[in-house]
Every structure is written in structure tokens, then in C-alpha cells.
Swiss-Prot record:
It comes from Glaesserella parasuis serovar 5 (strain SH0165). PANTHER family: ACREF/ENVCD OPERON REPRESSOR-RELATED, ACREF_ENVCD OPERON REPRESSOR-RELATED. GO terms for biological process: cell division; negative regulation of division septum assembly. It holds the Pfam family TetR_N. GO terms for molecular function: sequence-specific DNA binding. The gene is slmA. This is Nucleoid occlusion factor SlmA. InterPro entries: DNA-bd_HTH_TetR-type_CS, Homeodomain-like_sf, HTH-type_Tx_Regulator, HTH_TetR, NO_SlmA, SlmA-like_C. Residues 14-75 form the HTH tetR-type domain. Its main location: cytoplasm. Belongs to the nucleoid occlusion factor SlmA family.
Length: 201
């Protein structure tokens, strides 16, 4: 299958970097998303030489790092919006739904977060993804700890529950990748939530 070619007009370095990232995520979102994205393949899709790519990013590792940072910022904004629910239980449910819907709609992102898109890349990227999940766990933990102030009730172990919620997300990401995104997470979430809900009582 021929990769789509995008002609790049004269733009600032920052604009070109954003365009490279958009093409990269587009390749990861495609049916060939499980294939390794080489700089040759990426440069063809962008419509520039391999050498030109390195004018925008010093290495492919830096491209993926920028992409992971972008994913992190996007999800953080969604999570912050979900925290506005009236109580902790509803906030956690909204966050889980938001994260899983995002994963379903963005196969390339999910392949990065499960490590499948990074199998042949620098080990530093796997450490960066691990840091992403540590940050997610911290956000859950902070939200759970706020319950005592907001509702006058505390959990027995906020850290353990936060870790469980992150593990749940990771498991669903892997299930999506394993099914090649044929698994409909939205259809099954309410039943799964009924198993998580008792942890809030």
C-alpha cells in the first residue's frame, strides 16, 4: 500500500515539527500501524528527504518524545475536565471513560502507550511511557486523597486503588491492540464499572 504523501509548504520550524508529528501519528493510526515507522517511511509520507526530517528533530527518539508529551498534555486536559464531577466516584468513572474512549479513537496513541509502536526504538522511550503512567497514577491518587476533604470519607489505601485504576487502563489498552481495535470498549464499560464501583463504599 502506497503511503499518502503530504507536500509541506514553507513554514516555521515549529509548524513543520507539528506537521511531522501529525504524519507520524497518522501512520501509527493506519492499518499498517503495527509496522515499524522508519525515517525513510516517515519522510516519504511527509514529502521531504530523510535529511530534512533531522532539521526539525535531531532524532526519531525526539519525535516520539514530543508525541508522548503531546499525548500527556491532551489527556491531562481531559482528566482535569472530568474532575469537575460532583463526587469522587463520578469523577473517577468519567476519567476512566475519557481515557478509554481516547484510546479507542486513537490507535496510534494506544500502540505507543502499550509499547508496541516502540519495540525497535530507543529504550529511553519505554522509560518515558513508564513516566506517563506514573503521572497518571499520581493524578488518580491526588483525586482519591481529596475525597476526605470533599466528602468527609477517606479510602483505606489511596495508592493501592490508584495503582489498580491505572492497571485497569493498561489492560484495556492491551486488549484494544490485541483485537486490532475490533473490541468495542464503550459497549463493555458499564459492566466493568459495576465491578470497580464497590471499591468506593
Amino acid at each position: 500500500m502506497t503511503e499518502p504523501v503530504i507536500k509541506m509548504p514553507k513554514k516555521s520550524v515549529k509548524e513543520r515539527q507539528q506537521q511531522v508529528l501529525e504524519v507520524l501519528i497518522g501512520l501509527l493510526n493506519s492499518e499498517e500501524g503495527m509496522q515499524r515507522v522508519t525515517t525513510e517511511r516517515l519522510s516519504k509520507a511527509v514529502g521531504v528527504s530523510e535529511g530534512a526530517l533531522y532539521r526539525y528533530f535531531p532524532s526519531k527518539t525526539k519525535m516520539f518524545e514530543a508525541l508522548i508529551e503531546r499525548i500527556e498534555m491532551t489527556l491531562t486536559s481531559y482528566i482535569n475536565a472530568s474532575k469537575r464531577q460532583e463526587n469522587t466516584e463520578l469523577a473517577v468513572k468519567a476519567i476512566l471513560q475519557t481515557i478509554l474512549e481516547f484510546a479507542q479513537k486513537n490507535p496510534g496513541v494506544t500502540r505507543i502507550l502499550t509499547g508496541h509502536a516502540l519495540m525497535f526504538e530507543d529504550e529511553l522511550l519505554k522509560a518515558r511511557v513508564a513516566k506517563f503512567f506514573e503521572g497518571l497514577e499520581l493524578q488518580f491518587m491526588n483525586l482519591l486523597q481529596m475525597r476526605k476533604l470533599r466528602e468527609g470519607r477517606a479510602f483505606a489505601d489511596e495508592r493501592a486503588l490508584a495503582g489498580y485504576l491505572v492497571n485497569f487502563c493498561e489492560g484495556q489498552f492491551l486488549r484494544l491492540v490485541r483485537s486490532n481495535f475490533g473490541f468495542n470498549q464503550h459497549q463493555h464499560f458499564e459492566k466493568q464499572w459495576q465491578l470497580i464501583k464497590p471499591l468506593f463504599y
